[in-house]
């Protein structure tokens, strides 16, 4: 692929050559015609000035100052001495036609010119008589030798009829004299255009090199960014579109770098919190297992207490001994209830810590989402600038089209430049292709950012679920603590009843009934606690799953972050 410097140089050369061809064509057509018209106008004015000599001589004849012959000789003498533009002259012939007077070829004086023709077969003097009689004056084209030469040259003469004497006075312009004038003008213009063109090409060459360096710097930075290197920085200080691209690209890289740092930081935090959640879930499950074991113990002891109560009711003689057993069992039940309450409170503290950790993860996820949004916006800014470069490529294509039009105007001489102009259009299309490649790189960056954004959103949703589950677990633990406290109060009632049973045998029946009812209530409470423990075990398992999922997400983030070099 050709560099931008070579493309710009080729465009500059083609434009200069097109301008050169245009100047050449204009000088050989428009300027030639313009100079020819000016020369013809000068010839007309010169003939009219000489015509005044004839009028003056005729006036002298009319006044009687001179005879006609004298007046005509005076006019011929005066006109024969006039020269202009390096030996150009005037001649006089009549309407016969005969040569009246020719200052360069006097041997023609008095000759019949009706059969005189030039090498191209033009009866030039007959044409002069025809123009003079029909219009009084006009131009005639033919070939005639220059003074001091026998070679006929293309010539355009202006003739005018002097009716009083029947004379036709005329003078001519040699076409090759006009061509020499145009050639000198072409040489001067070619020299000027060449100097200017060389200067322009040199300027375009150096500008193209500067443009190429800027483009290579931007492309190199984009290639490094696409490979994950975020330590790059484009150093372009100009105030044109490339300077703006460099500024926006550096801002985008800075935002990407900040985003990756934030993601890396968040990943570490997510990994730490996921590990802590997993550890907390293990502690919670251990606590729930302890509570379950204690509940089983309480259930068994309550059953034992119920059996003892039945035995007490079946035999009053064993009341004293059984009441002591009941007191002992109730004491053990009270101690186990206290242990359960301690486990439940410890679970509450663990869940409070889990809520804080989940809130930290949620906040980090939101910050990461904000940074990703900023990076997306910067990528959109660079896409706008890339569209500006595409517009420049389109303008280059239009310039190539204009060069092709100018070459077409030059006709056969510019046919070769039409091919070059077509090549310029191809080069402009390659420039547009380069901008499309830049756009593709930006699209890859944006896809990566969007993927990170999706992962951040997923992280936020997961932390929301974790927080909801932890809060539900916390509420369930509150219920467990409340029920355990109620259970402890009921156990204290059982203890009081047992003491009353030991102290007063006469109240044994009523006390045993109260103990039986209370024991039944305790059994129900223990069953409810067991059900709550089962639910909490499910919640603890879900918390562990969330911790595992967060750990997996953290590993994925870590893999993405490790792709970048900060």
UniProtKB/Swiss-Prot annotation:
Q: Provide the positions where the record notes the PTM Glutamate methyl ester (Glu).
A: 310, 317, 506
Keywords noted in UniProt: Cell membrane, Chemotaxis, Membrane, Methylation, Transducer, Transmembrane, Transmembrane helix
Query: Which positions carry Glutamate methyl ester (Gln)?
Result: 499
Gene expressing this chain = mcp4
Entry protein name: Methyl-accepting chemotaxis protein 4
Q: How does it sit in the membrane?
A: Multi-pass membrane protein
Q: GO cellular-component terms in the record?
A: plasma membrane
Source species of the chain: Thermotoga maritima (strain ATCC 43589 / DSM 3109 / JCM 10099 / NBRC 100826 / MSB8)
Give GO BP annotations, semicolon-separated.
Answer: chemotaxis; signal transduction
Q: Which residues form the Methyl-accepting transducer domain?
A: 280-516
The chain positions of domain HAMP read 209-261
Q: What does this protein do?
A: Chemotactic-signal transducers respond to changes in the concentration of attractants and repellents in the environment, transduce a signal from the outside to the inside of the cell, and facilitate sensory adaptation through the variation of the level of methylation.
Give TM segment ranges.
Answer: 8-28, 190-210
State a single Pfam family of this protein.
MCPsignal
GO MF annotation list: transmembrane signaling receptor activity
- What positions belong to coiled-coil segments? none
Localisation per UniProt entry: Cell membrane
Does this entry carry the keyword Ion transport? no
Spell out the family assignment given in the record's similarity comment. Answer: Belongs to the methyl-accepting chemotaxis (MCP) protein family.
Q: Which PANTHER family match?
A: METHYL-ACCEPTING CHEMOTAXIS PROTEIN CTPL (PTHR32089:SF119), METHYL-ACCEPTING CHEMOTAXIS PROTEIN MCPB (PTHR32089)
């Amino acid at each position: 692929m050709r560099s931008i410097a070579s493309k710009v140089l080729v465009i500059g050369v083609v434009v200069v050559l097109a301008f050169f061809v245009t100047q050449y064509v204009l000088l050989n057509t428009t300027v030639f015609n313009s100079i020819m018209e000016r020369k013809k106008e000068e010839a007309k004015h010169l003939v009219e000035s000489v015509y005044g000599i004839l009028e003056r001589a005729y006036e002298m004849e009319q006044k009687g100052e001179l005879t006609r012959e004298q007046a005509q000789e005076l006019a011929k003498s005066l006109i024969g001495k006039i020269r202009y533009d390096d030996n150009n002259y005037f001649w006089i012939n009549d309407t016969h036609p005969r040569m009246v007077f020719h200052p360069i070829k006097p041997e023609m004086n008095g000759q019949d010119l009706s059969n005189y023709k030039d090498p191209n077969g033009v009866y030039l003097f007959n044409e002069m008589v025809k123009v003079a009689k029909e219009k009084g004056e006009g131009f005639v084209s033919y070939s005639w030798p220059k003074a001091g030469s026998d070679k006929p040259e293309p010539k355009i003469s202006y003739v005018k009829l002097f009716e009083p004497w029947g004379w036709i006075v005329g003078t001519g312009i040699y076409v090759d004299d006009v061509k020499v004038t145009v050639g000198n003008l072409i040489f001067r213009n070619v020299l000027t255009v060449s100097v200017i063109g060389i200067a322009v090409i040199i300027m375009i060459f150096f500008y193209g090199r500067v443009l190429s360096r800027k483009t290579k710097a931007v492309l190199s930075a984009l290639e490094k960014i696409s490979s994950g290197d975020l330590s790059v920085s484009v150093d372009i200080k100009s105030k044109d579109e490339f300077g703006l691209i460099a500024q926006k690209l550096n801002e985008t890289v800075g935002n990407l770098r900040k985003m990756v740092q934030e993601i890396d930081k968040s990943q570490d935090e997510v990994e730490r919190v996921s590990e802590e959640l997993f550890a907390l879930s293990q502690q919670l499950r251990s606590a729930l297992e302890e509570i379950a074991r204690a509940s089983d113990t309480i259930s068994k002891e309550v059953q034992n207490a119920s059996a003892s109560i039945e035995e007490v009711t079946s035999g009053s003689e064993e009341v004293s001994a059984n009441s002591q057993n009941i007191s002992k069992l109730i004491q053990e039940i009270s101690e186990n209830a206290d242990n359960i309450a301690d486990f439940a409170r410890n679970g509450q503290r663990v869940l409070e810590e889990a809520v804080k950790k989940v809130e930290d993860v949620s906040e980090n996820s939101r910050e990461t989402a904000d940074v990703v949004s900023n990076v997306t916006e910067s990528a959109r800014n660079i896409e706008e600038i890339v569209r500006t470069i595409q517009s420049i490529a389109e303008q280059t294509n239009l310039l190539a089209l204009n060069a092709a039009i100018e070459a077409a105007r030059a006709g056969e001489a510019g046919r070769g430049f039409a091919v070059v102009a077509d090549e310029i259009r191809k080069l402009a299309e390659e420039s547009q292709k380069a901008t499309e490649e830049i756009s593709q790189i930006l699209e890859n960056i944006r896809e990566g950012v969007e993927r990170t954004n999706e992962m951040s959103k997923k992280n936020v949703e997961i932390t929301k679920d974790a927080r909801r589950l932890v809060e539900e677990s916390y509420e369930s633990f509150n219920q467990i603590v409340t029920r355990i406290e109620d259970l402890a109060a009921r156990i204290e009632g059982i203890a009081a009843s047992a003491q009353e049973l030991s102290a007063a045998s006469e109240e044994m029946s009523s006390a045993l009934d109260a103990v039986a009812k209370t024991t039944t209530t305790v059994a129900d409470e223990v069953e409810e606690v067991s059900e709550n423990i089962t639910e909490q075990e499910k919640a603890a398992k879900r918390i562990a799953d969330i911790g595992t999922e967060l750990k997996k997400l953290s590993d994925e983030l870590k893999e993405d972050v490790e792709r970048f070099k900060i």
